[in-house]
């Protein structure tokens, strides 16, 4: 088992930052959690892993209030790309604006995967 895989128990911020920075991909994927809407949280708990296809609402930032489907997830950078959230480039083209999952709220879950349903119901 790799040294980084063990969760850090220290309360020192520098060690927490170092853990997140040096974490391997399979551990980083656990950081891509977002809060669930009120009706979903009653059934599935407070948070859930964001996956492509989920419908989310942006809660903070310039795009606050925008609702759209998750188009892409960048596990390495811990960012989520949402349809309808973009920024204009200098040449006039629209480019997707990645958002940190802590600024999102999941409003509709994709429940096609039986393993995901089982993990949500365990909570």
Curated annotation (Swiss-Prot):
What InterPro entries does the database record attribute to this sequence? KOW, Rib_uL2_dom2, Ribosomal_uL24_CS, Ribosomal_uL24_euk/arc, Ribosomal_uL24_KOW, Translation_prot_SH3-like_sf
Name the domain of life this protein comes from. Answer: Archaea
Q: Does the keyword Ribosomal protein apply?
A: yes
The intrachain disulfides are none
**GO molecular function per UniProt:** rRNA binding; structural constituent of ribosome
Single biological process term from Gene Ontology: translation
* GO cellular component: a single term: large ribosomal subunit
Keyword terms: Ribonucleoprotein, Ribosomal protein, RNA-binding, rRNA-binding
Is-annotated flag, keyword Nucleotidyltransferase?
no
Subunit structure, as described in the record: Part of the 50S ribosomal subunit.
For this protein, the record's HAMAP family field holds: Ribosomal_uL24_A
Assigned protein family: Belongs to the universal ribosomal protein uL24 family.
General function of this protein: One of two assembly initiator proteins, it binds directly to the 5'-end of the 23S rRNA, where it nucleates assembly of the 50S subunit. Located at the polypeptide exit tunnel on the outside of the subunit.
- What this protein is called in its record is Large ribosomal subunit protein uL24
Q: Which gene is this protein's source?
A: rpl24
